[in-house]
């Protein structure tokens, strides 16, 4: 299996190209120093492509670190985007630009040569042409136009081009594509990735987008005295998706050029020039209102007209821009409204959860409420609630690192449970008249919580993190693709787990939304899904749950078979609750491990049902009230009497309140058919009283 290395793959153009690479069947490794980007871009690419992307935070000038990536992965080709790219900034800090851009490229080419990797697609720029209007008949600009950059940024690009040409001249086995592109705009139509400049944007549309959402007062138009139809500069604006596809076309061209090496330049543009005001008006139309602007002096290094002649790319690469400026403006506005602060979320942070891994697949993602009272940490491993804290008091049982969750005696602490929660007798799953044998993992008698390789053992993609300061909430969306046949379950299922951390004023709450569906490409038409969270709670800030007062909404629960704890099909009345459906938990009792029912199970998606309080727990020592609300028809209440984690936790260290469907029984079971959606919503609320 070979890989394409993408430098600067967390950047604007690089990230969109990574998506296109994956969509075209390539395996990708990304390196980026994250100076002008965020790792959250990689997270979103993974969710968008449903594929893990190996990532390394590396500066290209670090030869040894870069070389290690080439040693770990069989690199077939390199797409080189990594660079500082602001024209105006380059005039103020030229040495930084030469050191980073040129120095980084030299380091990369050395490592490539040492590892016998001789295919490169270089992200150059139309700025290498400088002011092409100084020549006759050079607008639109062809590749044979004489170069003459007017700023240090452009100089770094032409310098790197010349270095690549020298490398090829010395060794004709190299295959080098130099792509000179013009003004990329827009965003991915999903709204998941787009341009997110850290600090003040240097380009027209990112700045204008921030004006539209109120982050900037007005747009500054740099000069209205150019020799154009409205006095503003002319640029060839190209949708970033078209640009990304141009890189795929160039890469394929290199691979299809079998006989010998090559080094060639191609312009990537639309061939149509637009003025600043024309693009401004198109974006205002997408937004639906006129935006404020003022005309200021020209920007150092800017030229009148940079419009591409893309005929060479059209003919040789079989590539042509398909999307319009209006398309780009609509996609940019979609990205901006969904991500008003880009990837910058102040109350979210992450750390590696698996300290021994070279990748970042297993992370610990932490969100704090805006008042600072409530904090929740979720791992990608099992989309697990690792820690929940109210005013510094930990509310749940868990481990400090991934190793703890991999222990054999881990009783599913905090994990997302699926594909089917709780027990299936003999692993015999009946779906629409067909029997399926699912994995047995409990004394060879039952399938418990999805089997040996249930959702609790899986690494979820994500999270996509978004914040809403007005609603005082932040969401983390995790995604898992569970393939047909895993643990014997039929069908390819996409599962989303969306956690919402919300400020309640006197505390905080954690919402858990589940959504699952069979993928269209799945070869099965039906499957089984039943999801829950298996957190163990302890609100007493002490080793046991002793002294906790519990009040349940129902005293009716499913009767269990004493041999394997699976339901008999009957609903019975609990004898362990008082007349108020309450109980005080002591050191040894009462013992609960029942699936309490609150309503009839008759829906696959309960998210539109009433959100009802089903349980309340309080503790006099901490004066914490823990309320469980759910749309689900049942909940499992378990006092943790079987917990025995050697040297860490003992019985009754915590209790479970798992909002769920009825435990599997053909009598109540509702299958998930293709085209349908499984859904539920639960809230865990923690407040002081």
From Swiss-Prot:
Cofactor(s) named in the record: NAD(+)
One Pfam family in the UniProt entry: GDP_Man_Dehyd
EC number per UniProt: 5.1.3.2, 5.1.3.3
One GO CC annotation: cytosol
Active-site positions on this chain: 534 (for mutarotase activity)
Binding site for NAD(+): 3-34
Highest taxon of source: Eukaryota
PANTHER family: UDP-GLUCOSE 4-EPIMERASE
NCBIfam families: galE, PRK10675.1
Function comment: Mutarotase converts alpha-aldose to the beta-anomer. It is active on D-glucose, L-arabinose, D-xylose, D-galactose, maltose and lactose.
Name recorded for this polypeptide: Bifunctional protein GAL10
Organism expressing this protein natively: Pachysolen tannophilus (Yeast)
């Amino acid at each position: 299996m070979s890989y394409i290395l993408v430098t600067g793959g967390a950047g604007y153009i690089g990230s969109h190209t990574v998506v296109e690479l994956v969509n075209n069947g390539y395996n990708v490794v990304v390196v980026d120093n994250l100076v002008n980007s965020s790792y959250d871009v990689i997270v979103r690419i993974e969710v968008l492509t449903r594929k893990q992307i190996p990532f390394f935070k590396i500066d290209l000038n670090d030869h040894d670190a870069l070389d290690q990536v080439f040693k770990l992965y069989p690199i077939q080709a390199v797409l080189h985007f990594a660079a500082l790219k602001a024209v105006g900034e380059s005039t103020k800090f030229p040495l930084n630009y030469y050191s980073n851009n040129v120095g980084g490229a030299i380091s990369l080419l050395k490592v490539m040569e040492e590892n016998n990797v001789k295919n490169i697609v270089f992200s150059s720029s139309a700025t290498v042409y400088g002011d092409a209007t100084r020549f006759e008949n050079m607008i639109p600009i062809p590749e044979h136009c004489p170069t003459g950059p007017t700023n240090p940024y452009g100089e770094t690009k032409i310098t790197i081009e010349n270095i690549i040409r020298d490398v090829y001249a010395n060794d004709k086995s190299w295959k080098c594509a130099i792509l000179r592109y013009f003004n990329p705009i827009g965003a991915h139509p999903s709204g998941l990735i787009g341009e997110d400049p850290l600090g003040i944007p240097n380009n027209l549309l990112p700045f204008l987008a921030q004006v539209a959402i109120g982050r900037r007062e007005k747009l500054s138009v740099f000069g209205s005295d150019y020799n154009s139809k409205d006095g503003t500069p002319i640029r060839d604006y190209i949708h970033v998706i078209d640009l990304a596809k141009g890189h795929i076309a160039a890469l394929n061209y290199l691979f299809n050029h079998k006989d010998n090496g090559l080094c060639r330049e191609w312009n990537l543009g639309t061939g149509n020039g637009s003025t600043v005001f024309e693009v401004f008006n198109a974006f205002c139309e997408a937004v639906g209102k006129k935006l404020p602007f003022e005309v200021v002096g020209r920007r150092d290094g800017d030229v009148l007209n940079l419009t591409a002649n893309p005929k060479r790319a059209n003919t040789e690469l079989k590539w042509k821009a398909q999307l319009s400026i209006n398309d780009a403006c609509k996609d940019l506005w979609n990205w901006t409204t969904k991500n008003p602060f880009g990837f910058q979320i102040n109350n979210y942070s992450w750390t590696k959860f698996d300290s021994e891994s070279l990748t970042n697949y297993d992370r610990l993602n932490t969100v704090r409420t805006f008042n600072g009272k409530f904090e929740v940490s979720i791992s990608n491993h099992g989309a697990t609630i690792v820690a929940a804290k109210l005013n510094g008091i930990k509310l749940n049982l868990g481990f400090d690192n991934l190793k703890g969750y991999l222990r054999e005696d881990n009783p599913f602490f905090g994990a997302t449970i699926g594909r089917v929660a709780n027990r299936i007798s003999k692993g015999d799953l009946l779906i629409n008249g067909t029997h399926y044998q699912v994995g047995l993992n409990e004394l060879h008698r039952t399938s418990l919580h999805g089997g040996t390789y249930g959702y609790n053992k899986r690494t979820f993609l994500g999270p996509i993190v978004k914040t809403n300061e007005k609603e005082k909430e932040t969401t983390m969306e995790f995604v898992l693709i569970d393939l047909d046949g895993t643990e014997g379950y039929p069908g390819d299922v996409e599962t989303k787990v969306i956690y919402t951390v919300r400020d309640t004023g006197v505390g905080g709450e954690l919402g858990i939304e589940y959504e699952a569906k069979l993928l269209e490409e799945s070869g099965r038409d039906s499957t089984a899904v039943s999801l829950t969270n298996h957190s163990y709670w302890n609100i007493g800030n002490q080793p046991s749950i002793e002294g906790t007062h519990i009040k349940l909404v129902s005293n009716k629960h499913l009767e269990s078979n004493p041999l394997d704890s699976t339901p008999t099909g009957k609903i019975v009345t609990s004898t362990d609750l008082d007349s108020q459906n309450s109980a005080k938990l002591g050191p040894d009792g009462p013992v609960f491990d029942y699936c309490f029912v609150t309503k009839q199970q008759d829906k696959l998606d309960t998210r539109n049902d009433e959100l009802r309080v089903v349980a309340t727990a309080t503790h006099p020592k901490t004066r914490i009230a823990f309320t469980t609300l759910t749309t689900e028809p049942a909940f499992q209440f378990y006092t943790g009497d079987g917990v025995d984690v050697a040297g860490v936790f003992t019985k009754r260290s915590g209790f479970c309140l798992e909002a769920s469907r009825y435990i599997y029984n053909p009598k109540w079971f509702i299958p998930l058919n293709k085209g349908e959606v499984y859904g539920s919503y639960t809230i865990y609320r923690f407040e002081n009283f």
